[in-house]
Amino acid sequence: SFSEVRNIQGDIPEMEDRPINVERADACEIHPADSGREEDCHQLELESESVNLIVTSPPYWQLRDYGIDDQLGQEDDVEKYIENLINALNRWKDFLHPKGSIFFNLGDKYHNKSVVGIPGMFAQRVQEDGWTIRNHIIWAKKNGIPDPADDRLVPRHEHIFHLVQNDDYYYDLFGYSQVYGNGSNPGDVWHMSHDRNTGDHLAPFPQELVLRAATLACPPKVCTKCGEPYSRKVERPPKNLNRDRPQAARAIKKFEDSDLNEEHLEAIRAVGISDAGKAKVIQGGAENNDSKVQELAEEAKEVLGGYFREFTFPLPKTVGWSGCDCNVDTVPGMVFDPFAGSGTTLNTAYSLGYRAWGTDLDRSNFEPKLNHYSD
């Protein structure tokens, strides 16, 4: 939910002037305001490397005609469609921060009674073009549009490609796992329903897709000078146990009633489960630790008994956010949707507190009261 994501994202900076900007433009023919290019394409007010996250879904191949020459999705053959997708990505690369991510929702199609295989073709080409597919996520749909076919199963999944430019990208798996995985890595299959009341748009993806992508890959704040994203600092405080577990609650009580201190708990972590039984024989835990550490661990074990094991794996906890050394103000991360469609990405990002920017050739699906348009 919005509240869960807002809570885990921490202190997103407040901005007095934070509109949702939407420009009517061809997503395949755009470039940043500071690019200096003189070619025939649409110059956005966005600057180079100012976008932290792109969440988008391009037009399906040969599905909807907007009545515009050379529009994406109306190519005669699928190979040209894939080529145009790759060219569009290379346009967007100019806007994307080096540590930024793209979550690219791509559907498949039946043609001449056969699945075309568009996601597979795209995956091969995008890697050949230098992008890294960090995850190939499956959107498993809990609901969908009725299908009249009586000789095959109804398609109930789409593909989401998480694309990055290099191996140094912003990623908050800890925050994501707190919301969507109960503290553990929840995997690459996203079970999501289509949103209701999405108007006349043919293929809106759900708000939850944007929530998930933003939680994973959009920093809550970035430096106004250098653009560096702030990253979560996670530690494991020795007493940070799951107190809902009776054993953990009892362990904390025994510790607090004793003369032990946190040095003893740190010693327990250092020694770990290798200090007992067969694990001690196999791993030689006691022999690999400083004598002082081993002494503290023995003292703790004598007081806590079997409950000392509870302190072996304390839970991780956010202790702050780290950024650059510019010592200037920060602003919320920037989310961009080149195929803004019904505005799901932009409105969701805005509701979370992020800055939001989009382009589209067809603005008929937007809610004018929520957005600022320019042609």
What is each stretch, according to the model?
Residues 371:
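Residue-level detection of the helix-turn-helix DNA-binding "recognition helix"
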